[in-house]
Amino acid sequence: MNNSLISKYIPLNTIVHNLDPRAKIFFVIWYLVDVFIAYNVLEFLILILMLLAIVILSKTSPAFLINSVKAISILILFTSLIHLVFNKKGTVLYEVLGWKIYSGALLGIALITVRFILVVAIMVVFMATTSPTEITSAIEKSLGFLQKVGVPISTFALVLSISLRFIPTILEETNRIINAQVSRGSDFNEGSLAQKIRKFIPILIPLFIATLKRADELATAMEVRGYSTTGVRSKYKVLKYNKLDYLSYILIIVITILIIL
């Protein structure tokens, strides 16, 4: 099973890793906004160069990014076909067996492809450089003011942290079950789509049981340690901004202004 899109945190000592997670979340959100408001070649070139700089600074493996993009190749192909069939904007460039291909369709395909690649790449880098604990701490710290009006931010942060932790665990468990089935002679690559789906059904029951077992073990461990979302808890690592964090805020805001103008 391809889990490139759901990357694990890779602990390294880089500039990107050492940024405050709140700054990284803000940067990623605004980068995604810039990706979808960008339209011309210069704007996308700025975003691509920024992404390349982040990849280099974070020491993220290019091969890992390529594998992540491959994971959404079917989605890109599907959206491209939709543009070819339904996008009638622009002039007719080609005509094959009565099927007209418009310039607007090709432009739409180019835009959606670049946007998909940039979105996946920035999310993969973010997940590889920010641990689940840092993400939840950043959310809890940023939205802590809502706790005063009765919104259970601590509970939400706990649920998010456990969810992020369980995703790679479930994927590893799925791979283990699939390997066990393959060793017994099962072949998940042969047959029609319906047959492939039926072959995955026997995986669901042991996966469901294993997931419940892991969840029960986690709940027991938290209960034994007296964990509570209502009490005041100290932090092992206190979030604190530094100069690089403020610089990242300024950088993404400047880039956004350049793209809008």
Where are these regions (language model features)?
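Small-residue-enriched core segments of transmembrane alpha-helices in multipass membrane transport
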Residues: 49-56, 69-77
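Transmembrane alpha-helix interface motif
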Residues: 1-41, 47-58, 144-151, 155-158, ...
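Alpha-helical transmembrane segments and their helix-start/interface "positive-inside/aromatic belt" motifs
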Residues: 24, 62-73, 245-248
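Membrane-helix interfacial "entry" motifs
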Residues: 13, 36, 59-64, 96, ...
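Juxtamembrane/interface alpha-helical elements of multi-pass membrane proteins
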Residues: 73-186
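Loop-to-transmembrane-helix entry motif
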Residues: 68-72, 76, 113, 117, ...
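Alpha-helical membrane-interface segments at transmembrane helix boundaries
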Residues: 66, 70, 107-111, 201
